[in-house]
Amino acid sequence: MSKRFENWTENLAIDWCISRQRFFGVPIPVWYRTDEKGEVNYNDVILPNISDLPIDPDIDTPDEFEEGDRGKPNGFIGEKDVFDTWFTSSMTPQIIAKWGLEDQDEMNSIFPMDIRPQSHEIIRTWAFYTIVKAYLHHDTIPWENVVISGWILDPDRKKMSKSKGNVITPVDTIEEYGADAVRYWAASARLGTDTTYDENVFLVGNKLVTKMYNAAKFVLSHDSYQINKLNEIDASFIRDLEEMVNNVTSYYEKFQF
């Protein structure tokens, strides 16, 4: 995964086009003056005051004009393009940390952040641009670690797609097998690799959880069970449990899920 990031970065040969021609998105806060014939002069840019942001140039007007001047000779016109989605989503860490507000305690306490969880297909977009923007504005990385997950594939190991009609929602799976069975299946996934939707694993997980539940219910149903008295086998179990917790914690901290 790191090699994919390196290859993308090292082979960039063009500038980042930050504008998109779409009907939705974050507006680019720019107007342009029109000449005496009503033609747009794209070199004569009108910028809003920072204190007025955010603005929509298709709705708001520059200070020296009125709405009636829009599209008229010696008037103005608003920028029609919107920002590339990665231009704005690459600011996610700063937005969460409330960068730019008067109280910067939260920004100073959580930025840079610890972990960015994301999928592998947007390494060259979301991960790359977020790092670029963090260096541009703060001269630092936005987070210490990136945790890359794979895709959930259908039973035939094909990418799930609405157009193909092979999407399986987690809600239906949880209702059929239970949340713990789904967790059991998810625990079998390896970091950075794709995982197949496998009902056999859900069935195994469901049976295992049911056995654990019944065993716990059986133990707790006996009044003779003395919680304050430890037998040798109880102490051995607690030692093994403590060792397991320490090992699992160590693995999690190293992202060895």
Residue ranges: model-predicted function:
Residues 1-228, 237-257:
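Structured secondary-structure scaffolds
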Residues 231:
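Active-site-proximal, well-structured secondary-structure segments within enzyme catalytic domains
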